[in-house]
């Protein structure tokens, strides 16, 4: 018998099949109401009609994902493009950030989700407090079935088949991994404030970078218990306005992060991450050559008369 990489350590690009394999790290969708909008397109931005919006609402989507250091420049292009348009950011609008995860293994992807979950409530309070509990932006605490599904998919090794439409309208959209090779973060309120969006992207990428280095998701649960929520937050959140907003929530910070860690526990301890079972491959050739002697002997014993050509 031969073995191959355990299921949990397989790269996502071997579990999912995407039409596009972009090199960029970040995709952004900005929903705006108001207008009128320019007749021509901004460089690397495509306008889409969004029927969930009102008053001439439109969604601008980055055409090609950009590297982290180009996020600010891309947003400035859109800002300049819309400078003469009336921009209205109502409760219906939001900013969605897609983080490319095609470079991750399944283990790293689970690490990323777990680490985000610990901070999720506090982060949503900073970037989109009015979206907390929104049915199109459900947090893990609002839909804890997502964690149970994730756990079962890891144990049964069926996770790619479980990422269905039920997960789309979440603060952290897991379904986007199956469809686009990203994790989509939907919590940010509608805005086109470049420093604010840049800080949000920086935060999401810092969590991804940490997830790539972690041994498994249980590390985060154990480390938070050892360091305490405040020091844990200081360690993993980059020093920016998003982190400042999280750390300012002293009255709820500990309870919120411990609740996030409790949600993560079922996933963090669902398998033995140190010794995941390998996938066994039989030595036999998948399609062995026919035994022609046996075939001819079998045919010789049959009455083939009357069989049409």
What do the predicted segments below correspond to?
Residues 25-27, 110-191:
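Aromatic/basic-lined ligand-recognition segments
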Residues 286-287, 294-306:
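A cross-taxon signal for low-complexity, glycine/charged-rich
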Residues 70-78, 102-127, 193-208, 246-252:
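Helical (often loop-to-helix) elements that flank the catalytic cores of nucleotide-handling enzymes
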Residues 1-86:
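Terminal catalytic/cofactor-binding subdomain
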Residues 88-104, 182-186:
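Histidine-centered divalent-metal-coordination microenvironment in nucleic-acid enzymes
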Residues 88, 121-135, 209-241:
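Flexible helix-coil linker/hinge segments at domain or subdomain boundaries
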Residues 168, 179-216:
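Beta-strand-rich recognition/accessory modules
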Residues 236-273:
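Acidic, carboxylate-rich catalytic segments that either coordinate divalent cations
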